Amino acid sequence: MFILALDSLEDLETIIEARPDAIVLGIEPFCARTRAVTDWNQLPALVRRMHEAGIQVCINLLAMIEQSRLQACTEAFGQLAKMGVDGLYVADDGWLEIAYAYNPETLSLLIVQPETLLCSGEDASFFARQGTQAQSLSHELSEAELIACVKTCPSCELLCAGHYSWMESRRGLLSNYLHQIEKPEDFQEGRLYTLREMNRHGRMPVWQDHLGTHVLSDEVFQAGEYLLPLREAGLQRYRIDCLLMGNTWGLDMLKAYRTLLTEGTDALSPKQKEAISSTIWKSSSLIRKEKSHGTR
C-alpha cells in the first residue's frame, strides 16, 4: 500500500491518474508539518472524489492536543468519522482516548506517527493491541532493526521517501533567537529558514508557526532497495511524504518504488536508482541525531 502525503492540493487530477492507494492531507487547526490543507467545506467533496477513484483519504492530525482544544478535537473526530475518511495520522495518545469514547471501533482509523519515538516492535504492538490501523516506525532505525520491528508487528508503516521530523518545540525558538541577536525584523511566521549544526554539513529546514518551531531532517530519507527485504519481512504500508519536495517529486517516487516492488531493481532506470538510493543505516543505533558519522 503506497500512501502519498501531499505537499499541496494542486493537480489533484494528476494524482488521481497516478493511483496512489491513499493520500494524506491536513485540516486546520489539528494538522502539523503539512502544506496540503483543506477545510471542512471542501473535504466532503474531496473524499467522495477520491473514493470514486479508489483512493483512500487520510487526515493529518499531528498537532498536539491541548486542554483548551480538547472539546474541539473531540468534535472534529466525530465529524471525520461520519465523513468516511479512511485514516487519521496522530502523534498524541489523547486521540486514542477520544476514539475510544466516541466508539471503540473507530480506533481502527488511527495511524500512530510519533516520529522518532516508535523504536521497537513491542512499541508498535502496544498500539496495535489498542486497535489502531497502523504504527509508523522511527526513521533512525537500521535495516535489521526495521525488519525485526516488522516481524514483531506486521501492521507497521514506514516512511520510504521524504523529509522526517527532527525536532518539535512549542517554543518560538526562531523568533527568540532573532530577537536575541537584535534582528527581530528578520522573523516571519511560516517562513522557511535553514539551520546548520556545528558537527553536520547539511542544512535542516526550519520554520515557526502557531504550533511552535519545526525542524526537519537535513536530507531526504530513502528506503531504497531495502524496501524489498522489508516487504519480505511483512511490511505492507509505504509512505511517501512530499512536504517541501512537491507533489511531482512524490509521484516520481511513487513510480520508482512501484517499479522496484513489482519488477525488481533491474527494472529501474539509472535516474530512478540514484533518486531512491537508500539512506537506511546498516549499523544498529537509536541515537542518529547526535552522530556526525556512521555506516550506511
What are these regions (language model features)?
Residues 1-122, 136-296:
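Active-site pocket-lining/capping segments in soluble small-molecule metabolic enzymes
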